[in-house]
Amino acid sequence: MKKIEMYHHKKVLVLGLARSGVSAATIMHKLGAFVTVNDQKPFSENPEAQGLLEQGIKVICGSHPIELLDEGFELVIKNPGIPYNNPMIEKALKLKIPVITEVELAYQISEAPIVGITGTNGKTTTTTIIHHMLNAHKENSSLLAGNIGFPASAVAENATSDQYISMELSSFQLMGVETFKPHISVITNIYEAHLDYHTDRSEYVQAKWHIQKNQTADDFLVINWDQEELKNLTKQTKAQVIPFSTTQRLGQGSYVQNGNIMFNDEVIGARDNILLPGEHNLENVLASVAVAKTLGVTNEEIMHVLETFKGVEHRTQFVVEWQGRKFYNDSKATNILATQSALKGFKNPVVLLAGGLDRGNSFDELLPFFKNVKALIVFGETADKIGRVGKIAGIDVHYVDNVEAAVPVAYRESAPGDIILLSPACASWDQYRTFEVRGNAYMDAIGELIEEVEK
């Protein structure tokens, strides 16, 4: 970890805990800052806060008292899930207190260069593929961080200059960066999302675009050339642009030609040898290839990963085949486009489990993708909205309380040869703390169903 002096004796408020808040508070404490942590969860139910108190860090739990900001803080590090219209954040900004997210701290202390990956969809898969490719080239040369793996600052604390940090980054995290500068930035795609958090689409796009704002001509920006919006934005960057495309023969960057994955007119390997199915995963593969080739990974090492990588947990993850049905866990489908992509990947009849946090979408965009859906099980805040679209499509719709209750209904409505797919098209936060918790609840419910039926 870089021994930076700028935080020594600085009065810092860490707002919101979870993993990233705990990491930020611990590191700030080590750097000599006077740290106060504020979290809404009551102290008695908050083991993270209890652990920080044992380190000598001041902890305030149970609410976010607005008057706390009158205590002369010089910096606020906020949990990325706390929106900028939160009263605490609004007051901090009004008082001209700098507000950052934990990834900014990670960059400041990191000795390792960062490969930062963002986008509406595909960032987890792309980050993971890049991580595997770099490690195939040189063992332990990549560390996973961000939304996947460990908090960015915790990884940065222990990373060395001969490693890379492969860091998945959300728009929430990128809104709070000032000096953050990845050596390689990746933008997989941009679609409409998180409009409950961002004021409008423009703010969302700009948050994603922040990933490259401090890059120089010595850095690289890997970007989806099939999206005109992103293509036009590249006129504003100082980084070297490396395009990728699933539809165009580019001649530079990564693309597909004559059934082969290409990079700068060089054949990397046959597309048919890639284990990951689906057009959406081709985007992820091409973005990963562009990064890997830029960092010196050989074609053989790249193809070894692509021929063996089965995908990311909770992302169209095959769970089990039982009673002739195949169960898939796509809990990470937290927006409509991700569910569209999942449905496109199946030819057999699908029993779809969907629903979750209401962000104001109508879900009409799912209608053309319901051709293969034979039954729809809905839950959460958006149950009525998604159910309405199912009824328009002429699908049998069943309303249940949660994912766990959806599994036995899905089994009852299915037949041998069918796909049972959890692909919610919504964030999990109305009922589950994370999409991982939701996905695990689904897989646990499948296990309980099998046990019950086979008694």
Curated annotation (Swiss-Prot):
It catalyses: UDP-N-acetyl-alpha-D-muramoyl-L-alanine + D-glutamate + ATP = UDP-N-acetyl-alpha-D-muramoyl-L-alanyl-D-glutamate + ADP + phosphate + H(+). GO terms for biological process: cell division; cell wall organization; peptidoglycan biosynthetic process; regulation of cell shape. ATP binds at residues 119-125. It is an enzyme of class 6 (ligase). Pathway: Cell wall biogenesis; peptidoglycan biosynthesis. It is found in: Cytoplasm. Its EC number is 6.3.2.9. Its main location: cytoplasm. Keywords: ATP-binding, Cell cycle, Cell division, Cell shape, Cell wall biogenesis/degradation, Cytoplasm, Ligase, Nucleotide-binding, Peptidoglycan synthesis. It comes from the Bacteria. One of its GO terms (cellular component) is cytoplasm. InterPro entries: Folylpolyglutamate_synth_CS, Mur-like_cat_sf, Mur_ligase_C, Mur_ligase_C_dom_sf, Mur_ligase_cen, MurD. The keyword Flavoprotein does not apply. GO terms for molecular function: ATP binding; tetrahydrofolylpolyglutamate synthase activity; UDP-N-acetylmuramoylalanine-D-glutamate ligase activity. Signal peptide: none annotated. PANTHER family: UDP-N-ACETYLMURAMOYLALANINE--D-GLUTAMATE LIGASE. Cell wall formation. Catalyzes the addition of glutamate to the nucleotide precursor UDP-N-acetylmuramoyl-L-alanine (UMA). Belongs to the MurCDEF family. This is UDP-N-acetylmuramoylalanine--D-glutamate ligase. It comes from Listeria monocytogenes serotype 4b (strain F2365).
